[in-house]
Amino acid sequence: EKCDVAACVGATWIAGGFAGAEELLAQSLKPGGIMLIGEPYWRQLPATEEIAQACGVSSTSDFLTLPGLVGAFDDLGYDVVEMVLADQEGWDRYEAAKWLTMRRWLEANPDDDFAAEVRAELNIAPKRYVTYARECFGWGVFALIAR
């Protein structure tokens, strides 16, 4: 049965990106229904591919800028009718919560096969975030209605 609202928030990679997620979600929506897409974007395009990789992505092409993302929704035939963008403080809280989670996991699982890998990530994640990703990444949830 078709629904009034369909959402993919933070997992568009499952469908190969926001365009693939849009295609899947559209199958579930009633005409005039609202689609919610949560997607990262570049607040500031990294100057080099190396900086993009330091942000934890493969390439600058992994994400669009905010104007590029809104334009891509338009190109797919959607009106953006609302958006909620994470501010930098909110993004900081999101990232920092991961560090605490890793720390607590390491305390509870010191002998786990993945402990060394998690420790290595925790050792570099805060500095990597504040050096590269914090200025480059944005994230938003976009409400879309098909034209």
Q: Which residues make up each language-model segment?
A:
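Short, glycine-/aromatic-enriched active-site segment of Class I SAM-dependent methyltransferases
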Residues: 40-60
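A short glycine-rich, Lys/Arg-flanked "PGG" loop and its adjoining helix->strand segment in the class I
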Residues: 19-34
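A short beta-strand submotif of the Rossmann-like class I SAM-dependent methyltransferase core
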Residues: 8-11
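A short acidic, Gly/Pro-enriched loop at the edge of an enzyme's catalytic core
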Residues: 1-6
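Short "lid" loop at the C-terminus of a central beta-strand within the Rossmann-like core
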Residues: 35, 40-45, 85-90
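Conserved Class I S-adenosyl-L-methionine
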Residues: 82-147
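A short His-aromatic
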Residues: 13-15
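Short alpha-helix
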Residues: 61-83
